[in-house]
């Protein structure tokens, strides 16, 4: 039978519940347990697909095409279990399901209320999510409850967790509460009162936490832990200090050293073998002792909010581990490139243009792509970054000066990137789309396997085929491909059924490393293995860096 660990948060948001939950899962998995994770989001949106990156950060896409919270990306990076649609749900989905049942008459004329109908539905979603785990029936399902204790939006989820714990009985569920212990500089001390009040609020709901994870910018002294223990009624050994670390991959060892996994296993009456965190130690060792160093410029419009590119940043870190290369990421505002030119790019070892939506900043990205192509600087374009690379090539090499995407210019006669007219909705149904259609749940989403053209750089990187995740509405227009190929561009991978371009590259006779991909490879990168595309990209950046390095006196050029 699956046992449950509920992870809640208090005082403020963004303390790192997702990292804490994923780190605990990694430790339990290293002890031989089958583990899955779920994220419950209290907002009323059906999913984060139409939410602004400034509001929500990255939208992580699962293998089966769900647009989910970025924490699911952390889950997949920390454990081997793949996430699915059922691993993330929102208040919007819960109410949508309950209202659909009410309209069908499933409640037999009863008054539909938050308790029991909404809370029962939440419990059903949790159990369904755990049962759908790709690892088979999990020994432990870790459930992260979004939001902060005290928020009105979170109350139904916390009540459902309380009811579920009561229904399942002792040793079947436990609660981990993550809270803030701030350092007040004027007083010169850590303050435990916010944590005390947060636990008090949780206990008012009927939940007594078994473990407290106390976030601070430094290690919490034992006397402060004892004070927190006394006021929160949590054993002192279960008051665990979680201080700021320079890498999230140090957190599993930090939590294990303080006995978190032992406390959880004791509470749930689990008897797995000892933890083996050598893989995490090896990864941290690689991260901290690189042999080389490169600087990669990420040209985008959300550069002030790096949460928007969370998986991409982590994918570059994974590549750095597996190539012994420190990767410095410089975030470059594409609108500044539009107004100030490409001078800010000239010291870079490689250029990356990530995915995105909307017209703002696109001409700056195109200018950066033109610079990378002409200066022979390694270039990787992802999703929109590939589409803009095709537009730049069409304009500046093929000679279609007004080439554009219909996303940015409906009137352009040279629609080298355009909206395709048939989509799959959230339930997998084929649906015709137009420019006026709703935005939510109407993109090409999820994993798709496609063959790779033999003899290409893509084949060197991936092998015979590629299986990656998508999130986009627009495609490279096949009508212009013959002209692009005549100019030298190579379409190195296509979808097997729709024959849509998935990868493009320039031959080495034109450029040493210039690749665009319509999919999002960052979603499948893990610290365990890295990702072949990002490893190849970092290696190309290193080769460029070494080629540009000045030759020392006495050395042969």
From Swiss-Prot:
Keywords (A to Z) from UniProt: ATP-binding, Glutamine amidotransferase, Ligase, Magnesium, Metal-binding, Nucleotide-binding, Pyrimidine biosynthesis
One GO MF term: metal ion binding
Regulation: Allosterically activated by GTP, when glutamine is the substrate; GTP has no effect on the reaction when ammonia is the substrate. The allosteric effector GTP functions by stabilizing the protein conformation that binds the tetrahedral intermediate(s) formed during glutamine hydrolysis. Inhibited by the product CTP, via allosteric rather than competitive inhibition.
Entry annotated with the keyword Cell wall biogenesis/degradation: no
GO aspect biological process, one term: pyrimidine nucleobase biosynthetic process
Annotated binding of Mg(2+), by residue: 71, 144
Recorded GO CC terms: cytosol
Domain of life the protein comes from: Bacteria
Active site location: 383 (nucleophile), 520, 522
InterPro entries, per the entry: Class_I_gatase-like, CTP_synthase, CTP_synthase_N, GATASE, GATase1_CTP_Synthase, P-loop_NTPase
Residues noted as binding L-glutamine in the record, renumbered to the chain: 356, 384-387, 407, 473
A Pfam entry, by short name: CTP_synth_N
Chain residue ranges for the region called Amidoligase domain: 1-270
Residues binding ATP, per UniProt: 14-19, 71
Note: CTPSs have evolved a hybrid strategy for distinguishing between UTP and CTP. The overlapping regions of the product feedback inhibitory and substrate sites recognize a common feature in both compounds, the triphosphate moiety. To differentiate isosteric substrate and product pyrimidine rings, an additional pocket far from the expected kinase/ligase catalytic site, specifically recognizes the cytosine and ribose portions of the product inhibitor.
PANTHER family given in the database record: CTP SYNTHASE (PTHR11550), CTP SYNTHASE-RELATED (PTHR11550:SF0)
Assembly description: Homotetramer.
Sequence similarity: Belongs to the CTP synthase family.
Name of the molecule in the record: CTP synthase
Organism, scientific name: Paraburkholderia phytofirmans (strain DSM 17436 / LMG 22146 / PsJN)
